[in-house]
Amino acid sequence: MKKKLSRIIRATRTRKRIRSLEIERLVVYRTSKHVYAQIISSDCSNVLASASTLEKKISNKVNFTGNKKAALLVGKKIAERALKKNIKKIAFDRSGFKYHGRIKELAESARKFGLNF
């Protein structure tokens, strides 16, 4: 329980800082089996774009949806959808997770395909 609570406290602290920037944020969440990404508006009221390993187009390309390759595909897809809506500059909200492994892979993939953060 302490590990989860610490992550939630880190996430809350990060979101507080990001809200002061008043730009869209890329929120990333991961479970043992899936990776989720959403771009949320600066006033925190609307989801502007989303992608996850639950989508058939992504899950069909990989054998297991909880790995780095799947996170790379989610990063690519979220970047494409953001650029379609003319969103180029965002803040990266890792939801208290370490910038390592799948989270890092998703972020680098989103940067590679055109998002700036």
Curated annotation (Swiss-Prot):
Disulfide bonds: none annotated. One of its GO terms (biological process) is translation. GO terms for molecular function: 5S rRNA binding; structural constituent of ribosome. Pfam families: Ribosomal_L18p. The keyword Manganese does not apply. It comes from the Bacteria. Keywords: Ribonucleoprotein, Ribosomal protein, RNA-binding, rRNA-binding. GO terms for cellular component: cytosolic large ribosomal subunit. Part of the 50S ribosomal subunit; part of the 5S rRNA/L5/L18/L25 subcomplex. Contacts the 5S and 23S rRNAs. This is one of the proteins that bind and probably mediate the attachment of the 5S RNA into the large ribosomal subunit, where it forms part of the central protuberance. Belongs to the universal ribosomal protein uL18 family. This is Large ribosomal subunit protein uL18. It comes from Wigglesworthia glossinidia brevipalpis. The gene is rplR.
